[in-house]
Amino acid sequence: MFKSRLGIALLMAAALPAGVHADNTIEKGDTSRVYDIDEVVIIDQPKEAFRLRQQPLSSTSFNGAQLQSLNVQDVRQLSAFVPSFAMPEYGSRYTSSIYMRGIGSRVYSPAVGIYVDGMPVLCRSAFNFHVYDVDRVDVLHGPQGTLYGMNTEGGLMRLYSRSPFQYQGTDVKFSLGTGFLRKVEASHYERLNDRTAFSLAGFYGGQNGFFRNQFDGGRADLINEFGGKGRLLWHPTGRLAFDFMADYQYTRQNGFPYGQLVTEDEIAAAPITSPLYGLKAGTQSPDQNRQSNYRRNILNTGAGIKYTGNGFDVNSMTSWQYLHDYMLMDIDYRPQDFLHLIQRQHGNILSEELSVKSRNGSRWHWTFGAFGSYQWLKTSAPVYFDKDMNAFLSKTITDYAYNGILNSMARGIAQGMIAGGMSKEAAEAAARALAAANIARTGGVNIDMAMDPVPGLFRTPTFNLGVYHESNIDLTPHLTATLGLRYDYSHVAIDYETSARVALQEHVFGVNISPVITSRLNRHEYDHFNQLLPKVGLTYRLPDGSNVYATWSKGYRAGGYNFEMFSDVLQTETSKAAKAARADLDIAHDEAYYERIAKTIEYKPETSWNYEAGTHLNLLDNQLHLDLSAYYMQIRNQQLSVMAGNYGFGRVMTNAGRSHSCGLEATLRGGALDNRLAYAISYGLTSARFDEYTDSVAGGGTIDYKDKQVPFVPQHTLGASADYRIDVDPAALLDPSSRFHLRSVTVGMNLSALGKIYWDEQNTVSQNFYAVLGAHADADFGPLHINLWVRNLTDTKYDTFAVQSAATGKRYTFAQQGNPFQLGVDFRLHF
């Protein structure tokens, strides 16, 4: 199987038309040159004074051709090609987990910010979107809080669309692939005159997927989505420019194809009657009695204004973002009918940013700015306790009541037997047998417990305000100092309304009672946070555009409130009350109880101090670019996503006291053979460990996670790509004058590798280092390109995500497998 798939890649390189020539000799006059992306794809930056590789930070950039070569359809597929960056493909479009430099989050406050055409994407549930019509992607590593505010502690990603002022015409792209991948994209760019230009684009994408739900045979990762966007650029004068944009996307998919992760020890210990008997160790196929699914509408709109003054630029960006989604999740991930969740989100976000930047040739380059945003988010998230869960709860409370009665009766009987001369051991055994017989004779003990769905309505408004300044001062012709400071204020609140109802049917000693237990929680909580986010850097410029730098900065992620764990709180509370209930009971909650709830659901802001040194080197007369950086981060109150409470009905954010992250990053980009060969290698080493973090466990004990690796963070990332263009001799063509004659063929391969990744705080479950190989061959027919591509050429088996759950009363580990071998073809037409 491996040889046959490797053969596909070799055929891509070998199956070239006659007359193709490739001169592999390196001539003395090789004209190869690697350019900074700022020199090729020019974007007006409203805040920065210098190009990316001239700033005191580590960064990675991709142009449109590089994104096409890597076949990037969303930002998750840049994982490993950016050092220390991982955004795993799992769950659904709802999932937006990004990990960079040892920090990240599966829920609530993100660690990496995203901007699209200068507009911030502020809704976490909208981070994972279809990428198309993109001309450039920048990834800035490390805290970017001074200029970009909270939730950019790990870094920042900026995406830029093609400008209709620079690019005109119509593009149509059609793709087919295994797993019945199908996709159509169409874009039109038109420059009406020197002052006005616009673009329109739309897409449809779908895939039947690779995994089936063993419960019903349905496709567990089916997806269909479509969308459209438009952009209008208007420059009424030489000083004033307007940029209006809107982007809508709709997604409907089956999601969360998690299968049980089974170890070799579990299989070896399984009896022949166990469902584990005879299985192969590893992650099994999904087997859920309900097919989890997700639907989402997102609309992002922005209005940018730029005024060019005498020696300064003023930029304004106003945005409105809308989210409306629906999620059904089988949260026990089992074929049994225990639990499921239905969640609906309805959100609106308004934001405004105003910045003023110097534009002159002086030694002082300055930026001032202010940012404000307000988010309204309403979430309805009822949790349904299904028949197997109610059966489990009924057995639990029945066993509790039966054993309590049995032990009480047996103690009294045993005392009499011991007084009559019987040994203690014999008396206790005889007493328990006699007590059990008496219980059975008088009607026994049986309690049926039915827990109604737990509704939950949560409103979580958020207000954020920031004011900032950054100066870059040329101390000498070679040395520049960077000084920045931001004041950031955030106000967070939660209004929650939730309740629980448990109906009991108690049959004890022939007496039947039917108590009903209810509990209601309704409260408003709020908090606010202030932070100063400084930045200090030094950049020393070397010849040929190279430089070395050092920087010190502070990172910040906002605090807030959990709400996914209320069903766990209410279930625990009502189950405890049910053990003593003899009549209807409405559980009362006093002020002290609500204060304890507030402490339970809140999580604190995360802060970090980042120390970094690095260099940007232009080597071999700009045939090679080498970027190196080393960093150390001291993290306080690191935010972690864990499963809630006793049963793990939802994910919650908690804080680890202290942790640290350190690492190395390297990126090498080069060109050779008169730019016919382009290659890139990136590597990231991350060591992220807890310094202070303890957690309570059942029975009142604690567990210490000191020196454990922070979960979900890959210790190594490795990305590599190489593309070789083979030009076609026109003399070898039948009709070289044809508009569609073959110009060149580009063959390439790429590799993305990550690991080791721990999936839990105790570091008991992990994914070893793995590598995924890709290949492509692109034929250039002028207006038409045909690209044959392969992903996961060697069909590597790996997990992209794993989670532990005790929703069924026993702790299991569930994981999602990475996509297997996939073959596809793209047709791109420009006219």
Predicted regions and their residues:
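Periplasmic-side early beta-strands and strand-to-turn transitions of outer-membrane beta-barrels
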Residues: 166-167, 175, 191-288, 323-338, ...
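Extracytoplasmic beta-strand/coil segments of soluble accessory domains associated
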Residues: 59, 76-119
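Gram-negative outer-membrane beta-barrel transporters
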Residues: 357, 367, 371-373, 477, ...
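Outer-membrane beta-barrel translocator/receptor signature
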Residues: 96, 110, 123, 132-135, ...
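Membrane-embedded beta-barrel scaffold of Gram-negative outer-membrane proteins
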Residues: 304-319, 323-329, 547-549, 564, ...
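N-terminal periplasmic "start-of-domain" segments of outer-membrane beta-barrel proteins
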Residues: 29, 34-68, 95-97, 165
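Solvent-exposed loop segments that connect transmembrane elements
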Residues: 211-218, 256-285, 332-339, 382-455, ...
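C-terminal beta-signal and adjacent terminal beta-strands/loops
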Residues: 377, 556, 676, 740, ...
